[in-house]
Amino acid sequence: MTLNKLRKKYIDFFKSKKHFEIMGKSLVPENDPTVLFNTAGMQPLIPYLLGEVHPSGDMLVNVQKCLRTGDIDEVGDLSHLTFFEMLGNWSLGAYFKEYSVKCSFEFLTSSDYLNIPKDSLYVSVFEGDQEIPRDTETAKVWESLGISKDRIHYLSKDHNFWGPVGSKGPCGPDTEIYVDTGKSKCSLDCNITCSCGKYFEIWNNVFMQYNKDENGNYIELGRKCVDTGMGLERTIAFLQGKSSVYDTDAFMPIIKRIEYISGKIYGQKEDDDRCIRIISDHVKAACFILADSSVVFPSNLGQGYVLRRLIRRSIRYAKKLGIKSHFLADLVDSVEAIYRSFYNELTEKKDFIKKELSKEEEKFFKTLSQGEQEFIKITRNLPSKTIPGDIAFKLYDTYGFPYEVTEELAIEYGFNVDKLGFNEHFKKHQKTSKKGGDKVFKGGLADYTYETTKLHTATHLLHKALQLVLGDHVRQKGSNITAERLRFDFVHSEKMTDDEIKKVEEIVNLQIKNSLSVKKIIMELSEAREKGAMALFGEKYDDLVSVYEIDGFSLEVCGGPHVENTNELGTFKIQKEQSSSSGIRRIKAILIDE
């Protein structure tokens, strides 16, 4: 069984059970600013689990890319991952506990699918408490399928209950499925709650059975849902008889390439193995972030900071392996080869990924050299073994040293870091930057005069023209439009050439000359996205949105206002193209009446 075969078998099985396959979402949540990345398969489907009607029906199956940053420091052991895939099937009121459990059991044990002996399976169910009864219903289903009572464990809310999101809302018990790896028990008390590695949790079925109200009461839901998640990497490790996810075909091609570059052999020395695992995990995660439709570049903020940290941490551990030259781009082919049959974005953006990794690598080699020298100089004169917060912040602010790198260096040299002090200086820096930013840039339209409206329409033409000239990765990151000029921030990592600027101007002016009509259409957000309408990524939209179509050229979700025809605009001229921030360019342009 391979990674790709398992993914396909899962999808095919649930499609045979009348589930509709839906596409996985972007790594970056579209309408959830509270998290940087999708961390679970159910995250993009929360609105539908909470009651919205899904356009594809009430029985769904998908594969969701996920990325968890909370455990980055744990990556390097045998199990923790930054990027992973979650296989999921969903019932939005169509079926409940019995059918869900029976489907899971069939997929796991059928000779047509995973063919796992049922005697290798262990399960947990909710033990009940004063508010919610014991989940004997699910336990009885497992018993009816041949899972003996001694392999059914009743566990507390901490283990076997999901939700609600916040203080109230839908929630319910779950049942977790474990496999026995065949390892010896670590003690007489060893069971599925033990972390010794004998038992692997591979699947979780969540049963949305209750609604918790504002008074803390649990009320039975009329429409009960099922949300399940199977970890692809953990499951394939078990099926391939491996003790670690890194020993599977999800990682070995990357590890083999690291062996070739470094001259180290995986499996010979634990310190080297840890470095190799960190590099293979982080480079894979970085490739998927760079390939994502959300368009993320390395930076010091949000998703960009996570990407930068993954890249720079890879470089730090490569140095420990003795890799002194640039190497990141050399690993991209190995990542792409593993996933090309399912994630074509890695193939389409392979050259772009290599380019961005190499650029960040070049930046960090300079930063690392200067920063390490400064670190050694500073610590040589410290009166204690604690690096003060202001010095740690200086390394960050002056040399671009992420706090985590300072912390890792500190451990190497026998120091610790005043993290609270660093955070205080960092917050002061953020406040100062925000005040300055508020003065410099205020987004949107200054007013709704005719001149401002014309420039607003010109902005739509500019947005599309930039995509045609520079590539589909171009996305609006902000705009500021007055009666005199437009200012447009967009995702692009390089300074535009004179030839590119000229081509953009020519495309915009051709659309003006062609007298294209501008129409406002009201449609559902899902329909707008299906039609390819551009939208501000991360913006929250209503179910019904206004979409402005510039006759066959541009389609964009927008509140308006706009002119009725492009022939009203005059001549478009770019006055300036410059950097706005890391990975973001800014254009200032005007319209000339002729």
From Swiss-Prot:
GO terms for molecular function: alanine-tRNA ligase activity; aminoacyl-tRNA deacylase activity; ATP binding; tRNA binding; zinc ion binding. Gene3D superfamilies: 3.30.54.20, Bira Bifunctional Protein, Domain 2 (3.30.930.10), Threonyl-trna Synthetase, Chain A, domain 2 (3.30.980.10). Its cofactor is Zn(2+). It is found in: Cytoplasm. Binds 1 zinc ion per subunit. GO terms for cellular component: cytosol. Keywords: Aminoacyl-tRNA synthetase, ATP-binding, Cytoplasm, Ligase, Metal-binding, Nucleotide-binding, Protein biosynthesis, RNA-binding, tRNA-binding, Zinc. It is an enzyme of class 6 (ligase). InterPro entries: aa-tRNA-synth_II/BPL/LPL (IPR045864), Ala-tRNA-lgiase_IIc (IPR002318), Ala-tRNA-ligase_IIc_anticod-bd (IPR018162), Ala-tRNA-synth_IIc_core (IPR018165), Ala-tRNA-synth_IIc_N (IPR018164), Ala-tRNA_ligase (IPR050058), Ala_tRNA_ligase_euk/bac (IPR023033), Thr/Ala-tRNA-synth_IIc_edit (IPR018163). It comes from the Bacteria. Zn(2+) binds at residues 456, 460, 558, 562. GO terms for biological process: alanyl-tRNA aminoacylation. SMART domains: tRNA_SAD (SM00863). SUPFAM superfamilies: Class II aaRS and biotin synthetases, Putative anticodon-binding domain of alanyl-tRNA synthetase (AlaRS), ThrRS/AlaRS common domain. Its EC number is 6.1.1.7. It catalyses: tRNA(Ala) + L-alanine + ATP = L-alanyl-tRNA(Ala) + AMP + diphosphate. NCBIfam families: PRK01584.1. Belongs to the class-II aminoacyl-tRNA synthetase family. Catalyzes the attachment of alanine to tRNA(Ala) in a two-step reaction: alanine is first activated by ATP to form Ala-AMP and then transferred to the acceptor end of tRNA(Ala). Also edits incorrectly charged Ser-tRNA(Ala) and Gly-tRNA(Ala) via its editing domain. Consists of two domains; the N-terminal catalytic domain (in this organism this is shorter than usual) and the editing domain; the C-terminal C-Ala domain found in most orthologs is missing. The editing domain removes incorrectly charged amino acids. PANTHER family: ALANINE--TRNA LIGASE, CYTOPLASMIC, ALANYL-TRNA SYNTHETASE. This is Alanine--tRNA ligase. It comes from Borreliella burgdorferi (strain ATCC 35210 / DSM 4680 / CIP 102532 / B31) (Borrelia burgdorferi).
